[in-house]
Amino acid sequence: MTSSADRSPVEAMVSHAEGAISEDDIVAAARERAVDLGAGPVTPAVGALLSVFARLSGGKAVVEVGTGAGVSGLWLLSGMREDGVLTTIDVEPEHQRSAKQAFSEASIAPSRTRLIGGRAQEVLPRLADESYDLLVIDAAPADQPDFLAGGIRLLRPGGAVVIHGASAGGRAGDPSANDPDVVGVREAARIIADDGRFTAVLIPLGDGLLAATRD
């Protein structure tokens, strides 16, 4: 176990950021269900940051790839407008049932969430161009390029994209690493970098967040 004295300043900062965020009982219950399902919920600090992005982006229409058990959705909804709608996509029906339970426990009106079951590669093309304020991708790193390529057209001018898992477990910065997850996160970063409409930043929370705003 690493002691506080052995941690780098960056590790200490991240630990402090995570410890500074508290979650209510509803989010905590959703987190517990996510762990039971193996859904890999976002950390509290990542959730809080998603709430901030939802608010800053306008928060009227948000699309999420990777519903999980609803932890990230609860955080996103907390930052969205009262009339904002979260569209969230997941291939696992059990995940979406758990998320629906979380939204109900949080007394979120059914009209504010649209849960779509299916593969994101098939769902995203059915959504309208330039109709969303924020795109959140929380999925397997190897799939990030496909989801980003299919979702980037959904963003209105001034919108933003946030990709969770952008560090691939810390391996993305290792020049010798070339497994599918590392290749995926690097390709997603390249797509953003090559698109002149976006300004991007890598944030060292959770498993790394790649965030970018569209001009």
UniProtKB/Swiss-Prot annotation:
For this UniProt record, the keywords arranged alphabetically read as follows: Methyltransferase, S-adenosyl-L-methionine, Transferase
| InterPro entries referenced in this protein's UniProt entry, alphabetically | Cation-dep_OMT, SAM-dependent_MTases_sf, SAM_O-MeTrfase
Binding of substrate: at which residues? Answer: D138
Q: Where are the transmembrane segments?
A: none
Q: What is its EC number?
A: 2.1.1.-
Q: Provide the residue positions that the database annotates as binding S-adenosyl-L-methionine.
A: V42, E64, G66, T67, S72, D90, V91
The lineage's top-level taxon is Bacteria
Q: What class of enzyme is it?
A: transferase
Q: Which GO terms describe its biological process?
A: methylation
Q: Give GO MF terms, alphabetically.
A: O-methyltransferase activity; S-adenosylmethionine-dependent methyltransferase activity
Keyword match S-adenosyl-L-methionine: yes
Annotated Pfam families: Methyltransf_3
Q: Which Gene3D superfamilies match?
A: Vaccinia Virus protein VP39
The entry's family comment says: Belongs to the class I-like SAM-binding methyltransferase superfamily. Cation-dependent O-methyltransferase family.
Check the record and name the PANTHER family matching this protein: O-METHYLTRANSFERASE RV1220C-RELATED, O-METHYLTRANSFERASE-RELATED
Q: Which protein are we looking at? A: Putative O-methyltransferase MAB_1361c
> Per the UniProt entry, what species is this protein from, by scientific name?
Mycobacteroides abscessus (strain ATCC 19977 / DSM 44196 / CCUG 20993 / CIP 104536 / JCM 13569 / NCTC 13031 / TMC 1543 / L948)
